[in-house]
Amino acid sequence: MGAARRFVDAQLRDWGLDDLVDDAALIVSELVTNSIRTGCQTRMLVGVRRPTDRMVRILVGDGSRSMPVMVQARPDATSGRGLAMVHRLTHGRWGVTPLPFGKVVHADLAMPR
């Protein structure tokens, strides 16, 4: 997970998008954690794209066909809040693309105005 966070951090700083680094680090951490929890621990793809000047897209792909599901975590739960945080940080702009070999989860993070 540390390598994924460092990769995203370096790319955003290279693009001069330092204001997005903290939120992006949290997003990539949650997506990678979900990928690991669904059993994909050996092969994972992490990417960052910039589809527009005002948005970055964080991608995490893996070989699991298990789709992520956002759940309502109980107040005393120690897990289950990751996708809800991703949903909040992206204002609902995240999704999953199923592929023959697994899936890619993307999360779109907008530049602050």
Report the location of each language-model feature.
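Histidine-centered phosphotransfer motif of kinases
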Residues: 23-41
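Short low-complexity stretches enriched in small and charged residues
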Residues: 1-2, 12-17, 60-65, 77
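Conserved short strand/loop->alpha-helix "switch" segment adjacent to the catalytic nucleotide/phosphoryl-transfer site
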Residues: 2-29
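Conserved beta-strand-loop-beta-strand hairpin that lines the nucleotide-binding pocket
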Residues: 36-113
